[in-house]
């Protein structure tokens, strides 16, 4: 139980540092390690089992929505049942003093966002090693009926690997709170949709039903960024970016990375197809095609990726309508 038995809003009131040292649901808060619009993640100590965990606390208003609470319970149980080396294990999910929480394995690594910000575009072999581990995790989730819907560098943790042949161990996180739960319960604001703009599939934008192929699209956006340094679509405002995902063709990766084999462009174009039916059927099928296409790539002599130890052929479509001025690229031509 929460120490002091205070009301749920006390957990989210004041400064984040106010929670340091407090006990919540049998966990002692040590420090904040991540924050989003609907949740805060802390490193915490499991006082019952004497282990370090990542404890995610959801915004109190989520617990007050019965539909969300039901889906949260179901999806957390499904996520906890997935035993996969590239998925962060969920230890426990529950509610205390009106706040929903998820306790997960604490991964000693940094996320892919941090790695890209620090190192820029990655060598093809490094990008492929990361991609295949994420793809394996996603396909395992799909086999259990879970679609992630928010694959992005910030949800991909990169930890130290076991040896020189496996220098990175990658974990996919944020399965206990899939974005469908938020969309079904009204926790999206007017003018917003569920997903992260740079990586969202066209069908998510249009509100159509989604399956694992939306994760194929998002993974392809991430893979593109790992090798190009930027996501495939760069626009000057959110509406233009949404338009690009729905109607614009992705720029060939080889324009930014001429050292990469040309067939990689075709693989990425298929994975980034506007229609799910024109994409690869699975994430691993996409990455397998990517690795085959990249065999002719010329490595540029980058040093091996140093993982931070402190923490962890395009299908044809009918021509789209001409975009309005606000939807044109920031750097046309």
Positions of PLM-derived features:
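AlphaC helix of the eukaryotic protein kinase fold
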Residues: 59-81
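Protein kinase catalytic-loop region centered on the HRD/HxD motif
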Residues: 134-146
């Amino acid at each position: 139980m929460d120490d002091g038995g205070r009301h749920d809003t006390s957990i989210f009131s004041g400064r984040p540092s106010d929670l340091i040292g407090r006990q919540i649901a049998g966990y002692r808060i040590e420090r904040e390690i991540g924050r989003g619009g609907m949740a805060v993640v802390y490193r915490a100590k499991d006082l019952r089992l004497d282990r370090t965990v990542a404890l995610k606390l959801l915004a109190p208003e989520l617990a007050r929505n019965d539909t969300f609470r039901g889906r949260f319970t179901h999806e957390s149980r499904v996520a906890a049942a997935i035993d996969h080396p590239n998925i962060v294990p969920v230890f426990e999910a529950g509610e205390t003093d009106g706040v929903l929480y998820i306790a997960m394995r604490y991964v000693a690594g940094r996320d892919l966002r941090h790695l890209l910000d620090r190192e820029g575009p990655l060598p093809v072999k490094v990008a492929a090693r990361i991609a295949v581990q994420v793809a394996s995790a996603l396909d395992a989730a799909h086999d259990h009926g879970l679609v992630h819907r928010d694959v992005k560098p910030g949800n991909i943790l990169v930890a130290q690997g076991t040896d020189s042949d496996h220098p990175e161990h990658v974990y996919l996180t944020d399965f206990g709170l899939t974005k469908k739960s938020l969309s079904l319960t009204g926790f999206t604001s007017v003018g917003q949709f569920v997903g992260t703009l740079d990586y969202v599939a066209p069908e998510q934008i249009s509100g159509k039903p989604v399956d694992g192929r939306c994760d194929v699209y998002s993974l392809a956006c991430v893979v593109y960024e790992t090798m190009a340094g930027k996501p495939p679509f760069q626009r000057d405002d959110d509406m233009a970016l949404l338009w690009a995902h729905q109607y614009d063709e992705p720029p060939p990766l080889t324009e930014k990375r001429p050292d990469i084999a040309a067939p990689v462009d075709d693989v990425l174009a298929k994975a980034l197809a506007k229609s799910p039916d024109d994409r690869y059927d699975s994430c691993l099928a996409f990455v397998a095609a990517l690795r085959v296409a990249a065999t002719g790539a010329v490595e540029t002599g980058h040093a091996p990726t140093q993982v931070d130890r402190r923490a962890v052929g395009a299908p044809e479509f009918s021509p789209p309508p001409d975009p309005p001025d606000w939807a044109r690229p920031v750097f046309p031509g």
